[in-house]
Regions:
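Alpha4 helix (beta4-alpha4-beta5 surface) of REC/receiver domains from two-component response regulators
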Residues: 96-113, 117
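Short amphipathic alpha-helix used as the core "switch/output" element in two-component signaling
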Residues: 74-85
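Active-site residues of response regulator receiver
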Residues: 65-66
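Conserved acidic carboxylate
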Residues: 17
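Two-component/phosphorelay signaling modules centered on CheY-like receiver
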Residues: 20-40
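Acidic catalytic/metal-coordinating carboxylates
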Residues: 44, 72-75
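Acidic, metal-coordinating helix/loop segments flanking the phosphotransfer/catalytic sites
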Residues: 41-61
Length: 142
């Protein structure tokens, strides 16, 4: 609980990332720097779609890599288009070309970050998403 007696819940997150090394480093960093709790990990587009379906309104943040073992992160962004207003979808990629950023944003990504140079901005966005999720009623679509 915070000083006002409000329960501070971590940001329930679905992580779509096929690299074990990146996951091993990213998960503890997200927990420490942005109060993120990873509730599901997906290495493929089909695993991510199952996680989105399983958790429905109960996730707050989807962190999506674009190039997966099988399938594309763009598929996940399409599936997130009807997400609730409290839910955020961000792309964390090694290929943040201007064209790829444009495509991701057109598909409804809230933001696109370069894994190699924009992690500080990514963590700031996670903190902002956590604040918004706590203040946004669940069950309303974007």
């Amino acid at each position: 609980m915070d000083a006002k007696g409000v329960w501070e819940m971590p940001l329930s997150t679905i992580l779509v990332e096929d690299s074990p090394t990146i996951r091993e480093n990213l998960i503890p960093a997200m927990a420490e720097l942005a109060d993120v709790q990873v509730i599901a990990i997906a290495e493929t587009a089909s695993e991510a779609l199952l996680a989105l379906e399983k958790y429905g309104e109960d996730w707050d943040l989807a962190v999506v890599d674009l190039f997966l073992k099988s399938g594309s992160g763009l598929t996940i962004l399409r599936a997130c288009q009807t997400r609730g207003s409290h839910q955020h979808a961000v792309v964390l990629t090694n290929y943040p070309t201007s064209e790829m950023r444009r495509r991701c944003l057109e598909l409804g990504a809230d933001a696109v970050f370069d894994k190699s140079s924009e992690l500080d901005a990514f963590f700031e966005h996670c903190n902002s998403a956590r604040t918004q999720a706590r203040n946004q009623p669940r069950g309303t679509e974007r």
